[in-house]
From Swiss-Prot:
NCBIfam families: 5S_RNA_mat_M5. The keyword rRNA-binding applies. Mg(2+) 2 binds at residues 56, 58. Gene3D superfamilies: 3.40.1360.10. GO terms for molecular function: metal ion binding; ribonuclease M5 activity; rRNA binding. This is Ribonuclease M5 1. The gene is rnmV1. It is found in: Cytoplasm. CDD domains: TOPRIM_RNase_M5_like (cd01027). Pfam families: DUF4093 (PF13331), Toprim (PF01751). Signal peptide: none annotated. Its EC number is 3.1.26.8. Binds two Mg(2+) per subunit. The keyword tRNA processing does not apply.
Length: 185
């Protein structure tokens, strides 16, 4: 599988794992303290080839994703579930632990930001669905993030991410039906 865009990852181990799964060029941020020089490189690559942000499903990965998104609106995003990024032994979550199949699957389900898009799902929709409060809210958000392949978020961030990626009411409804069926988990 050849990827035209440059994939932005956190470190060299992520690059190695990505290149085991697909034929792609990567750019490493070398952690969550992204320099202006690195952001300039990402912006240059975005203009020339396109960019896919593919970070770990943890706090640092989300921080990197947010920094890049704010600096360069319109980048594409690939997400791994925490399960797919879990180490087989001790350690933290990371792209470097994902199987080649999980990486290819994430890259097959990219999201492109629509920074100024109108929200298609309301905050009320999230509340009615039990995604912002209640005993199951956190678990439902986790499942929703996995099903839609948009990563885990808290209630406030979920609204922003659904808007950013223009998740449709139909996609949202199908996801809710799936995540609330206990037989699927």
């Amino acid at each position: 599988m050849k990827i035209k865009e440059v994939i932005v990852v956190e470190g060299k181990d992520d690059t190695k794992r990505i290149q085991m799964a697909v034929n792609a060029d990567t750019l490493e941020t070398r952690g969550s303290a992204i320099s202006d020089e690195t952001l300039d490189q990402i912006e240059d690559l975005y203009d020339k080839r396109g960019v896919i942000v593919f970070t770990d499903p943890d706090f640092s990965g989300e921080k990197i994703r947010k920094i890049i998104t704010e600096a360069i609106p319109g980048v594409k995003h690939a997400f791994l579930t925490k399960h797919d990024a879990a180490p087989s032994h001790k350690g933290s979550l990371g792209v470097e632990h994902a199987s080649p199949e999980a990486i290819r699957e994430a890259l097959a389900h990219l999201y492109t930001e629509v920074p100024d898009g109108e929200p298609l799902i309301s905050r009320e929709d999230l509340a009615v669905a039990g995604l912002t409060s209640g005993p199951q809210a956190k678990e439902y958000r986790r499942r929703l993030g996995e099903y839609l392949r948009i990563g885990y978020t808290n209630g406030k961030q979920l609204y922003k991410r659904l808007k950013l990626f223009q998740i449709t009411p139909d996609e949202f409804k199908k996801a809710l039906e799936y995540i609330k069926n206990e037989d699927n988990y």
